[in-house]
Amino acid sequence: MGVNMTNTLSTGKDDFYRQMFKLTIPIIIQNLLSAAVNSADVIMLNYVGQSAISAVSLAANYSYILFMVYYGLGTGASLLCAQYYGKNNIQAIHAIEGIALRFSIAISALVALVAFFAPQLMMKIFTSDPELISIGSSYLRVMGITYLCWGVTEVYLAILRSVGRVTISMALNMLAFVLNIILNATFIFGLFGAPKLGATGVAIATASSRLVELVACVIVSFMSKNVKLNLTYMFIRSKVLFRDFMKLSLPALGNDVSWSVAFSMYSVILGHLGTDAVAANSLVTVVRNIGSVFCFAIASAGTILLGNVMGKGDLEKSKVYASRMLKMTVIAGAIGGVIVFAITPLVMRFASLNDGAMYYLKYMLLINTYYIMGSAVNSALIAGVFRAGGDTKFGLICDTIDMWVYAVPLGFFAAFVLKLPVLWVYFLLCTDEFVKWPWVFHHYRQGKWAQNITREDLFEQEKAS
């Protein structure tokens, strides 16, 4: 009896790691490609000038915030879709996709309008430097086109990932990323007879690649049997699913937007401490993203796998899977820190910044060798484990208090009241992830996050009512 039980547990463990690697590898490749594109942007702009790097880095905060909005909407959609996919309810998945598209398209259109008509106002929030405002405004005006495409593709790709089609999602992103790098080089350096457009060229390249990605999504949708990109899904009405979506998405959206806006406040603080700090931070962000790809891929894959298990009603199994996922994340976080440390000399060798920015760059990179671990563990639990069971409120409360009550006020106080040196301000800002660890681990051990959030006979009940 004991031998059989051991074999059963061993098989379950093997099955978990097999499924995790099947989901994680494409996501890692996708994240690496994304980091590679961002790296290419910064490396190419490095040859244009420090002002171009700084301006694009500040203007890109809007893309980051908007991405977090899409991520929040995609989270609500993918959490529901992952669990309904576990029940093989495709009709519910279509309705959920339609709800997410309604919100993403409306938000994209609003931000695009502001980028078209008031880009200077958007830049003045981050800097008072006239040169940076001018460069960033040209960049934002073109990026408005990107926002319109992005809102549709991010929702569809989130739905594909939620049903386990991570390879297709990876392939579509790969197409956009490779095209982005080629077009960046073309418009920044004036290749193939194109004009040298600098920062504006980066925006044109991004907009073009996102448009191609949208077209590719339409083609994939046409070939798909069930999970399609269909705007008519926006007109599917389900009061129950809408309530469930709002219950999950609003806290997730609020969490992601609150966190991303607060994180952008770090750029506001650094932006008013000088262009050297901004330029150094733009390179550090790229390196940190490279070091974090394994961690965030595990969190994304874990959300899909745990969601499917919970949708089938096996809550105890989901807790075992969550424990294994956390162990994988800790290992990945340690590896990420080593990667950042290992490539620091290479970054220092090829960065073309002035002496002040190079000094900041060196020590900011060292700080991020440990910062990755804090970010990895919190992402795995808050954005992975907890959300897989529909627990999105905890992250909203936890991150809002951590960022807006602790980190952002501390950063402003350190920079503008105590007037501490730039590196001390940066160090204090990078304590944000570790401050919330006790709270996060306590919530994890309680196990209340493990829930089956699907409903039986969903559309039949609505027809009856």
Mark where each language-model region is:
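Short runs within selected transmembrane alpha-helices of multi-pass transporters and secretion channels
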Residues: 74, 143-162, 169-177, 202-217, ...
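Interfacial/gating helices of multi-pass transporter permease domains
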Residues: 45-64, 130-135, 199-201, 241-248, ...
